[in-house]
A protein has these predicted regions:
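Charged, glycine-interspersed solvent-exposed loop segments at helix/strand-loop junctions
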Residues: 23-26, 35, 39-52, 91-172
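Sec/Tat signal peptide C-region and signal peptidase I cleavage site
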Residues: 15-23
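Cleft-lining beta-strand/loop regions that shape enzyme active-site pockets
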Residues: 23-91
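Bacterial N-terminal signal peptides
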Residues: 6-15
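N-terminal secretory signal peptides that target proteins for export/translocation
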Residues: 1-2
Length: 172
C-alpha cells in the first residue's frame, strides 16, 4: 500500500511540474507589411503560445502588442520596440505616410503603449524606441531558463513570416 501511495504521489508530482508548451521568440524583426503581421499574429493568438520579445521588434512587428493578450507577452533586457507612422509607396515611388493605417496601428496598441507614444509626439515617420526600464515596467520579464533556442532569420529586403522565430521551452 505504501508503494502504491508513493507511486501515485510521484505520478502526481511529475504531472504537476508545468507542461512544456510552445514559445515564440521575437528578435531582430524589423517589420514589414501590416497585413502579413496581422494574419501571423491572429494565428499566434489562437495558438495560445507565449511570446518572448528578446531583441528588436519594430514597425509592423509591434502589432504583436495588440494582437496577443498582455499576460502572454514577456520582455528580456535586450527587448526593443520600434514605432513609426505607417506608410505606402506614393505615385513617384517614394514613401508617403498613410494616416488611416497609422491610426489603425495606434489604436491596436495597449493604452500604456499609446500613452508612451503620445508623450513623445505620436507616430511620425521617425522611429521611436521603447526599451529598458520603461518597457520592463509595461510587460513582465522573461525567464530565460525557458531554454528557447533561436534560429537567425534570413535577410530579405522585406521581412517575411519566417522572421518570427519559434522555439520550445518552459516558462516558470
Amino acid at each position: 500500500m505504501k508503494f502504491l501511495t508513493g507511486l501515485l504521489a510521484a505520478v502526481l508530482l511529475i504531472a504537476g511540474m508545468g507542461a512544456s508548451h510552445a514559445v515564440v521568440r521575437i528578435a531582430d524583426d524589423r517589420g514589414g507589411r501590416i497585413g502579413t503581421y496581422v494574419d501571423k499574429y491572429q494565428d499566434l493568438r489562437q495558438s495560445g503560445e507565449t511570446v518572448i520579445i528578446d531583441g528588436l521588434c519594430a514597425s509592423a512587428c509591434t502589432i504583436v502588442l495588440g494582437a496577443i493578450p498582455h499576460d502572454r507577452i514577456c520582455v528580456t533586457s535586450s527587448a526593443t520596440l520600434g514605432f513609426h507612422a505607417a506608410w505606402d509607396f506614393g505615385s513617384n515611388g517614394r514613401a508617403v505616410t498613410n494616416p488611416e493605417a497609422t491610426q489603425m496601428l495606434y489604436s491596436m496598441y495597449p493604452s500604456q503603449v499609446r500613452r508612451w507614444i503620445s508623450q513623445r509626439g505620436g507616430l511620425t515617420p521617425h522611429m521611436l524606441f521603447l526599451r529598458g526600464k520603461q518597457l520592463q515596467a509595461m510587460y513582465k520579464p522573461c525567464y530565460m531558463d525557458a531554454q528557447a533556442s533561436t534560429i537567425k532569420p534570413s535577410r530579405r529586403s522585406l521581412p517575411q513570416a519566417d522572421q518570427i522565430e519559434s522555439a520550445r521551452g518552459q516558462l516558470r
